[in-house]
Amino acid sequence: MLQHIRPAFISLILFTLLFGLIYPLTVTGIAQFVFPDQASGSLIFQGDQVVGSRLIGQAFHRPEYLHPRPSIAGDGYDASASSGSNLGPLNPDLVKQVTERAAAIRVENQDQEAVIPADAVTASGSGLDPEISPAYAGLQAKRVASARAMPVVEVERIVAENTQPAFLGFIGQPRVNVLAVNLALDARFPIQRPPMP
C-alpha cells in the first residue's frame, strides 16, 4: 500500500509546484515583459493616482459626464458582484426595465423622440462594460455640452477621438470608452466641482 501512496504524493507535490507556481509565474513574467500595460490591468493614471481601468466600467451619474451602460453588478459597477441579469428576452421584468430605462434616458437627455440604442437600456453579460456604442454616446452629447457650457461639436470630437473601430474591421462593433471620454472632457473643459463621482 505504501508503495502506491509515495508516487501519488510525489506527483501531487510535483504538479502543485509545476502548475501552481512555476507555470503561473512564467506566464505572468512573460506577460509583464511583452504586454506590461495589459498585464497590469490597463490602468489609467492621472499623475501618480490610478483613476480606473480601460477594461472595467465605472458609474457616472452627473449630467456633465457620459453615462455607461446599465449595470446590475451591485451599486455602482461593483466588480465583486459582476454578473448578467439572467432575464430572458420575453421576461416581463426585462421588458419593464427596458421601458423604464428608455423613458429615463429620454427625460435626462431632453429628447422625447430619441431612438434609444440597445446598449443604453440593457446590462451586459458582466455588468462591468467600460464601453458604449457611438450611438449612445451621440445621444448624450447635447446633455454633456449643455452641462459644461461647451459646444456640442467639441463633445462629438472627443467622442470620435475615443471611438475604437470593430476589431480587425469586422469583428464586433465600434465602441466608445466612457472613462477615456470623461477624462478628456475634464482635461479640455474642466468644471468647477470636484472631478469624478
From Swiss-Prot:
One of its GO terms (molecular function) is P-type potassium transmembrane transporter activity. The keyword tRNA processing does not apply. The chain crosses the membrane at residues 7-27. The keyword Ligase does not apply. Keywords: ATP-binding, Cell inner membrane, Cell membrane, Ion transport, Membrane, Nucleotide-binding, Potassium, Potassium transport, Transmembrane, Transmembrane helix, Transport. GO terms for cellular component: plasma membrane. It is a single-pass membrane protein. The system is composed of three essential subunits: KdpA, KdpB and KdpC. PANTHER family: POTASSIUM-TRANSPORTING ATPASE C CHAIN, POTASSIUM-TRANSPORTING ATPASE KDPC SUBUNIT. Part of the high-affinity ATP-driven potassium transport (or Kdp) system, which catalyzes the hydrolysis of ATP coupled with the electrogenic transport of potassium into the cytoplasm. This subunit acts as a catalytic chaperone that increases the ATP-binding affinity of the ATP-hydrolyzing subunit KdpB by the formation of a transient KdpB/KdpC/ATP ternary complex. This is Potassium-transporting ATPase KdpC subunit. It comes from Beijerinckia indica subsp. indica (strain ATCC 9039 / DSM 1715 / NCIMB 8712). The lineage of its organism: Bacteria, Pseudomonadati, Pseudomonadota, Alphaproteobacteria, Hyphomicrobiales.
